[in-house]
Amino acid sequence: MIPGEFKFGQGKILCNADKKAITIEVKNTGDRAVQVGSHYHFYEVNSALDFDRKLAWGKKLDIPSGAGVRFEPGDVKKVNLVDFTGERRIFGFHDEVNGYLD
């Protein structure tokens, strides 16, 4: 093995394979780009993003950890969201939850 080398198993790595995803349409109504990271509580994203926020309660983007989705002004995109798991406690972001989701 070479120092720093990674050896991966065979086949594809599936993210969130065991989680049910929903698809929503999101429009950036603002005049600036908005970037949303993989672990951000989607319900609390920038208010310039227009979508049915009730559907996003307790959910995050269905993308690999550390990735993000960028919405340019006027962009309309469909994104997949999955539930937060574990204790389902959310703190920070825009301070709209600060506790248990359920």
Curated annotation (Swiss-Prot):
Its EC number is 3.5.1.5. It comes from the Bacteria. GO terms for cellular component: urease complex. Keywords: Cytoplasm, Hydrolase, Plasmid. It catalyses: urea + 2 H2O + H(+) = hydrogencarbonate + 2 NH4(+). One of its GO terms (molecular function) is urease activity. GO terms for biological process: urea catabolic process. It is an enzyme of class 3 (hydrolase). Pathway: Nitrogen metabolism; urea degradation; CO(2) and NH(3) from urea (urease route): step 1/1. It is found in: Cytoplasm. NCBIfam families: PRK13203.1, urease_beta. HAMAP family: Urease_beta. Belongs to the urease beta subunit family. PANTHER family: UREASE (PTHR33569:SF1). Heterotrimer of UreA (gamma), UreB (beta) and UreC (alpha) subunits. Three heterotrimers associate to form the active enzyme. This is Urease subunit beta. It comes from Clostridium perfringens.
